[in-house]
Amino acid sequence: FRGHDKKDKKIQKK
């Protein structure tokens, strides 16, 4: 899922 920008990048690279 894509919610934040840098916070999600650490969880998923998509």
Curated annotation (Swiss-Prot):
<keyword id="KW-0689">Ribosomal protein</keyword>
<keyword id="KW-0687">Ribonucleoprotein</keyword>
<keyword id="KW-0694">RNA-binding</keyword>
<keyword id="KW-0699">rRNA-binding</keyword>
<protein>
    <recommendedName>
        <fullName>Small ribosomal subunit protein uS19</fullName>
    </recommendedName>
</protein>
<comment type="function">
    <text>Protein S19 forms a complex with S13 that binds strongly to the 16S ribosomal RNA.</text>
</comment>
<dbReference type="GO" id="GO:1990904">
    <property type="term" value="C:ribonucleoprotein complex"/>
</dbReference>
<dbReference type="GO" id="GO:0019843">
    <property type="term" value="F:rRNA binding"/>
</dbReference>
<dbReference type="GO" id="GO:0005840">
    <property type="term" value="C:ribosome"/>
</dbReference>
<comment type="similarity">
    <text>Belongs to the universal ribosomal protein uS19 family.</text>
</comment>
